[in-house]
């Protein structure tokens, strides 16, 4: 799934760490109403980011995360960027820089992280459009600083709903069986194709009965 990809967890984890007030509220159980499984997902993202940032070679990214976190905690004036702007800044560092530098003529397997990061920026951009987020501001918005209210809405509502609904990873519709990947197909999709190994499921199942008894009685009368 999209949200289980390593590059997505790392990107979201770094983004979360850039908002220490959200992290503090999360750790103090202010968001206790969140689904436990989703809470664990948030924790996994934070742990993934912390583990990566612990590497001495990630000093530049670690400095960026810390600088942004301090700035957002003590925000006095509106920023000249939004959440998507933060993502673009984040992508200037490794490993995102290398991922986004992958040649577009490589296979689907190698391009998947690139496509997933592109989809993440689209999702964040759509959130900003729907919520009219033009800046991150310390001004009051519904009883909280706008930067805090919007970060909560982004992580606790928007991403939660997307995570709960499920988002598929990038797939190339023109390539049913890319090298190094396992294809999941319907019987209709697989017609006329040959594979060295085929696994089928539910062979003993039968189609669901969806007949309308009232309609059947009318037709038979």
Where would I find each of the regions flagged by the language model?
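Conserved short internal alpha-helix adjacent to the catalytic or cofactor-binding core
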Residues: 2-48
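Accessory C-terminal helicase-associated subdomains
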Residues: 52-189, 193-194, 205-218
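Short Ser/Thr-interspersed hydrophobic loop/turn segments at strand-loop and sheet-helix junctions
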Residues: 199-204
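Conserved catalytic alpha/beta cores of large enzymes that bind or transform nucleotide phosphates
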Residues: 221
């Amino acid at each position: 799934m999209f949200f289980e990809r390593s590059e997505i967890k790392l990107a979201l984890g770094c983004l979360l760490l850039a908002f220490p007030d959200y992290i503090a509220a999360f750790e103090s159980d202010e968001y206790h109403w969140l689904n436990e499984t989703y809470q664990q997902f948030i924790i996994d993202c934070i742990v993934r980011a912390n583990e990566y940032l612990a590497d001495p070679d990630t000093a530049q990214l670690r400095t960026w995360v810390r600088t942004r976190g301090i700035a957002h905690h003590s925000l006095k004036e509106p920023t000249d960027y939004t959440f998507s702007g933060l993502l673009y800044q984040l992508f200037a560092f490794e490993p995102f820089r290398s991922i986004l530098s992958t040649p577009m003529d490589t296979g689907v397997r190698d391009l998947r992280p690139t496509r997933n990061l592109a989809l993440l920026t689209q999702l964040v951009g759509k959130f900003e459009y729907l919520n009219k987020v033009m800046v991150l501001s310390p001004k009051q918005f519904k009883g909280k600083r706008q930067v805090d209210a919007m970060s909560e809405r982004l992580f606790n509502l928007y991403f939660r709903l997307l995570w709960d609904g499920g988002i598929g990873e990038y797939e190339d519709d023109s390539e049913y069986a890319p090298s190094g990947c396992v294809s999941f197909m319907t019987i209709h999709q697989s017609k006329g194709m040959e594979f060295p190994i085929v696994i089928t499921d539910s062979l003993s199942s039968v189609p669901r009965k969806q007949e309308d008894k009232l309609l059947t009685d009318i037709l038979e009368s």
